[in-house]
Regions:
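Histidine-/acidic- and/or cysteine-rich, low-complexity loops and terminal segments associated
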Residues: 1-18, 315-317
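Non-globular, low-confidence helical/coil segments that flank catalytic cores
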Residues: 18, 25, 144, 194, ...
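Hydrophobic alpha-helical transmembrane segments in multi-pass membrane proteins
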Residues: 20-174, 235-274
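Conserved residues at the C-terminal ends of beta-strands
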Residues: 11, 35, 345-348
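Alpha-helical transmembrane segments of multi-pass integral membrane proteins
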Residues: 133-230
């Protein structure tokens, strides 16, 4: 329960949450722990309702939200997505809504946080906000929420592929279900428990989060691996975004909608299958890995790299989480090239420098055969 409390309320996930972090990431719903509009909206609304109950007028309340926003932003480490959400909330108080609200928010962000768009979190936060702004007026009710979840997931796809090169189709349904669950159940529950923890720690609700984690593990076993789409070049990314904008404009014209949709599918196909022969040598730490792919898509990988381990006694407190060379270089590169299967994995040596990261590679990709 502690990790969910710090994660959902303050945006901090400890290292002992690593297993669940990987499961949430593989299912494409780790963004639920990224502080954004859901948390900001919940806390701002709760703050307003509390002060209104105490008898404050709307005019006084409007100005009290500014110091509250500053304190909350500080507690979350001035997260880019939180700053964006708070700015939009504060501007909405003054009657600035819709695209005007979004445009002014981006302008202010450029002034106070010039490096905002240099981070994946900043770009994704603004992209989500823009799509929500464009689709928020189209219908109400459960059907509209489900359609909105689908539109957001598909609309953000080019940017997700640019930064992460993969997409989990299950995330569309899971985001719809778990965002509702987190917003309606867990945020209020954890907020109350957090306040009570200063008086008396309440641990009786641990079973709820154990139950949630068991469900996540079950869904992870049933769900397929994320789709590896590949990383588009800058020009292909721009072309994808323009095409998606045209799809939105022509959404009521079936023929044009179908035409642009097929064009987008074709672009994603070219990203994943470049239709060219490729030989790449990768620096994987203490050795090199060679990747080969022909025009038909057959792939061969020679060696996976690794780290030489030395027998050095360390105490428990000195142990730390480490990332393998393959997770830093080899796996991200292969995914950026649209690779989801390695037909032949050739290991030229049994030394750690050649085969040390074999387990990480076999977890990340389907491997046809291993040759030693």
């Amino acid at each position: 329960m502690r990790n969910y409390m710090t994660g959902l309320l303050l945006g901090h996930l400890d290292t002992d949450f690593e297993e669940m972090n990987e499961l949430y990431s593989s299912l494409g719903i780790i963004h639920l722990f990224a502080l954004s509009g859901m948390q900001v909206g919940f806390f701002m609304d709760a703050f307003k309702k509390l002060l209104l109950r105490l008898g404050l007028t709307q005019e006084k309340l409007k100005w009290l939200t500014y110091p509250f926003s500053l304190i909350y932003a500080g507690l979350t480490g001035f997260s880019a997505s939180v700053i964006r959400s708070l700015l939009q909330k504060l501007l909405a108080q003054h009657g600035i809504k819709g695209l005007d609200n979004f445009a002014l928010t981006v302008l202010v962000l450029f002034i106070i946080m010039p490096n905002f768009f240099l981070t994946a979190g900043g770009v994704l936060s603004c992209a989500y906000a823009f799509i929500l702004t464009m689709t928020s007026k189209e219908g109400e009710g459960l059907k509209a929420v489900a359609r909105e979840s689908l539109v957001i997931s598909l609309g953000i796809l080019p940017i997700l592929s640019f930064y992460f090169a993969e997409f989990q189709p299950w995330s569309i349904l899971l985001t719809f279900v778990f965002s509702f669950l987190f917003d309606v159940v867990f945020l209020p529950l954890l907020s109350i428990l957090f306040i009570l923890s200063f008086i008396y720690p309440v641990t009786q609700f641990n079973f709820v989060f154990e139950w949630l984690e068991n469900i996540i593990r079950l869904v992870s076993q049933l769900a397929s691996r994320p789709l590896v789409l590949g990383q588009p070049t800058t020009w292909l990314l721009i072309l994808l975004l323009v095409s998606l904008a045209l799809v939105y404009d022509f959404r009521k014209n079936v023929k044009r909608l179908a035409g642009f949709s097929l064009f987008i599918v074709g672009l994603f196909f070219l990203i994943k299958h470049p239709l060219e022969n490729e030989i790449t040598m990768l620096d994987v730490g203490q050795g090199e890995s060679i990747f080969l792919r022909d025009v038909t898509g057959k792939t061969i990988l020679i060696d996976v790299g690794g780290k030489a381990e030395f027998d050095k006694k360390i105490q428990a407190w000195q142990e730390k989480a480490t990332t393998s060379n393959a997770q830093r270089t080899l796996i991200p590169y292969l995914k950026s090239r649209g690779v989801d299967k390695i037909d032949q994995l050739i290991l030229t040596n049994t030394d750690k420098e050649h085969v040390g990261d074999l387990l990480e590679v076999t977890k990340a990709f389907h491997v046809g055969e291993i040759l030693v």
